[in-house]
Amino acid sequence: MMSIRQRREIRATEVSEDFPAQEENVKLENKLPSGCTSRRLWKILSLTIGGTIALCIGLLTSVYLATLHENDLWFSNIKEVEREISFRTECGLYYSYYKQMLQAPTLVQGFHGLIYDNKTESMKTINLLQRMNIYQEVFLSILYRVLPIQKYLEPVYFYIYTLFGLQAIYVTALYITSWLLSGTWLSGLLAAFWYVTNRIDTTRVEFTIPLRENWALPFFAIQIAAITYFLRPNLQPLSERLTLLAIFISTFLFSLTWQFNQFMMLMQALVLFTLDSLDMLPAVKATWLYGIQITSLLLVCILQFFNSMILGSLLISFNLSVFIARKLQKNLKTGSFLNRLGKLLLHLFMVLCLTLFLNNIIKKILNLKSDEHIFKFLKAKFGLGATRDFDANLYLCEEAFGLLPFNTFGRLSDTLLFYAYIFVLSITVIVAFVVAFHNLSDSTNQQSVGKMEKGTVDLKPETAYNLIHTILFGFLALSTMRMKYLWTSHMCVFASFGLCSPEIWELLLKSVHLYNPKRICIMRYSVPILILLYLCYKFWPGMMDELSELREFYDPDTVELMNWINSNTPRKAVFAGSMQLLAGVKLCTGRTLTNHPHYEDSSLRERTRAVYQIYAKRAPEEVHALLRSFGTDYVILEDSICYERRHRRGCRLRDLLDIANGHMMDGPGENDPDLKPADHPRFCEEIKRNLPPYVAYFTRVFQNKTFHVYKLSRNK
């Protein structure tokens, strides 16, 4: 963080609890060997205590989340089909590939089934390892088959315990990052406590276990911790190389386990670019990190059989553009303030233009359309034009992709996290502006630099990185609620670091003329301890009540549907329906699907729009022809979609389909002038009347309070 450059005399009686220091005072060491020995012993003791607490708090968090999951579902007591149904939507799809690998006679056949899969999308053979990020399921299935644990641990428990184990690593990485920034493990303890007490806003692992982000975010946290250490000045060559290795491995694993990796790392690249441009980060270290990002993505691209979406990512185009712009624009960091500011703006414009140019060229060469729905969504979200695009509106109408709800800040304030975060953020932003202005003013004036060395605050590179990181990811979370988990966890780290930072308190006490070394020590330890006591007092009873509250999984209609499919349909039958439900059909029954929730493919999106015409105003023969074009044998209709009330008018699935088809929406309210009344009634409603035009094409074979299954005729 901010360090006063002017050194003061260090007294032998002062004992530091800091993390391994960046510099050693050789003169003091020669004069006071006994003092230095005691200092080293204290540091070893501090490291031991801090490390032990880090491991314990990580394991306790893991056990806590696993217990919540068990208590909420009574997972150990319910049937296998109920366990599988509890993996909702895309979670069930991912878990099905773990199950598929375990059921394969051999590993080779299991791999072959994933590479040449013809059950995930009917009438198509796709490479699942290319299309999806499921190497983690492959790795776990291999481990389960190889390790001698089959007699003691069911496959589903091996899977979920691995995910909860990763949560232990996640919390430990957050703890270490805060410790590295502040110099005391007390900061890490506070970060971990905040993470747990704000669980609703920091993680959703206990009810979305197989979700890709639950695999990826622990590695992302490790990467941030490693980058924080790497950006420290004066690292030993061996330490630097080992840290680079840790950054590379964690970046690679993060990229391998989540399809949105490229967008998160693009944010990181923007952080590096900002700091490098403002001379707040060594350019050499920024170059290393750019290179690691590109290398990791290219390795993942190879493992995913040259997935074109990775090659066409904005991250690769941006990082290459930064390298090219550096070569084209020399002496970027010299000259007066206005001179440097002009060069910086030109540099920014050049990088932006090169990024867009390279990205468009790559996408045209590869004929890449897989990510176009994301850009359509962003364009509509930020008001750059209204759209009737079904895919974009599907995202816009989901709460998870909306703005961060205001009540989030109320919950974060209850734990004092938000107040502490704003306090620390305000101070560091002011210091960052001062440092950036000084760096741009006159980098060639040695007198100016000398003056700064003697009396001006400075921003450490690792602190500057985490500051810009938290700001950019904060904007991301504010704009898209689903991404809040990337911000709130780092918020815990940044707030706890600031409260335990000696530089923060030194700056604050000096500004109110109360500076005293003892006061700094008192403030940096007493404030976090008081907050920890407050958190224990206020939230411990609630956490104990939460752990004692027992519920049970209950979804009899879905269980009945899955059992009926298993008992009454051929194993090669093809099912159509909603993406979310079909993921469960794939997992519980192994039947072939027409569509599924992994939405990162343009042809799948077109197929899904066609299948969803079952909820639109279409003629029975049109719907039948569309479904049969995908080889559909059975279609599942859900009352919860056909008569949906959860979303407002204009955001119900049937409304999105009506708008995309140019039809007027149901119910009172305005319609766009060019929308016209449909020629046919809504299919999902009319088919239940068993009228001749519908009976000729569809025969009802199953029905309960939630689902209606129809068998398609083949002779039409």
Swiss-Prot record:
One of its GO terms (cellular component) is endoplasmic reticulum membrane. It is found in: Endoplasmic reticulum membrane. Pathway: Protein modification; protein glycosylation. CDD domains: Dpy19L3. It is an enzyme of class 2 (transferase). It is a multi-pass membrane protein. Its main location: endoplasmic reticulum. Pfam families: Dpy19. Residues 65-154, 257-262, 307-308, 360-414, 486-487, 540-716 are lumenal. Changing N118Q: Does not affect endoplasmic reticulum membrane localization. Does not affect mannosyltransferase activity. It catalyses: L-tryptophyl-[protein] + a di-trans,poly-cis-dolichyl beta-D-mannosyl phosphate = C-alpha-D-mannosyl-L-tryptophyl-[protein] + a di-trans,poly-cis-dolichyl phosphate + H(+). Residues 185-197, 216-230 dip into the membrane without crossing it. One of its GO terms (molecular function) is mannosyltransferase activity. Keywords: Endoplasmic reticulum, Glycoprotein, Glycosyltransferase, Membrane, Transferase, Transmembrane, Transmembrane helix. Glycans are attached at N118, N704. Residues 1-43, 183-184, 198-215, 231-239, 280-289, 324-338, 438-465, 500-522 are cytoplasmic. InterPro entries: Dpy-19/Dpy-19-like, Dpy19L3. The keyword Nucleus does not apply. The C-terminal luminal region is essential for C-mannosyltransferase activity. C-mannosyltransferase that mediates C-mannosylation of tryptophan residues on target proteins. The reaction occurs on the luminal side of the endoplasmic reticulum and involves the transfer of a mannose unit from a dolichylphosphate mannose (Dol-P-Man) donor to an acceptor protein containing a WxxW or WxxC consensus sequence. C-mannosylates RSPO1, a Wnt signaling regulator, preferentially at the first Trp residue in the sequence WxxW. C-mannosylates the netrin receptor UNC5A, preferentially at the third tryptophan of WxxWxxWxxC sequence. Belongs to the dpy-19 family. This is Protein C-mannosyl-transferase DPY19L3. It comes from Homo sapiens (Human).
